[in-house]
Amino acid sequence: MGAKDLAEKNLLQYKDVFSDIVNVNLFGGKCYVSAEELSREPGELITKTVSDDKLRQLQMDVPMKCKKNNRSFFLCLENQSDKNNVMPVRDMGYQHAKYMEQIKEAKESNRKTSNYPNPMTKELNDSQKLSPVITLVLNYSQK
């Protein structure tokens, strides 16, 4: 990882910078997400591939959780220095892993409390909602 990439990640970890970027790019500059509503999330996600059942490590650049009006959603800023045609697929992988992490936590909670959904094929109870996962790619290339 280059010094430039580290500097970009370091800057984006400041919650006020992060919220400004999100507000400008998602909400047209309206102050919807404040720095106070953000908390840092681990960037490392461990997931299991379906094809060969092996564990894989994914590394998101700067993920944060936003708690607003008793609801939560996840935001991730990804830096891109050069054009990369597979970036959307990588982002889908990050989002998939984050959703699967939430499902795993909800199912574990159900197991601990013996509060299983009915029928079991539903996997989650009707009251268990997944928090949205939103990724923004910041492309710094000139192309």
Positions of PLM-derived features:
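Accessory alpha/beta interaction modules
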Residues: 1-143
